[in-house]
């Protein structure tokens, strides 16, 4: 099964992710958020003008690599 360290690490990672998501939803988009869905990307927030298509493609490739 899983060791105590693995369970603790999973629980802490989940807690930190929930805290970050709560913080991001509480602030009114102070930064540019990229939502990658399928073959498209939606940019929301401020300072999105500085992002290039290469940056979005790199993020998409990184996430695709994490899924595999």
UniProtKB/Swiss-Prot annotation:
The lineage of its organism: Viruses, Riboviria, Orthornavirae, Kitrinoviricota, Alsuviricetes. It is found in: Host endoplasmic reticulum membrane. TGBp1, TGBp2 and TGBp3 seem to act together for cell-to-cell propagation. TGBp1 is the main movement protein that physically cross the plasmodesma with the viral genome. TGBp2 and TGBp3 would facilitate TGBp1 function. It comes from the Viruses. InterPro entries: TGBp3 (IPR003411). One of its GO terms (cellular component) is host cell endoplasmic reticulum membrane. This is Movement protein TGBp3. The chain crosses the membrane at residues 7-26. Plays a role in viral cell-to-cell propagation, by facilitating genome transport to neighboring plant cells through plasmosdesmata. May induce the formation of granular vesicles derived from the Endoplasmic reticulum, which align on actin filaments. Keywords: Host endoplasmic reticulum, Host membrane, Membrane, Transmembrane, Transmembrane helix, Transport, Viral movement protein. Residues 27-68 are cytoplasmic. Belongs to the Tymovirales TGBp3 protein family. Residues 1-6 are lumenal. One of its GO terms (biological process) is transport of virus in host, cell to cell. Pfam families: TGBp3 (PF02495).
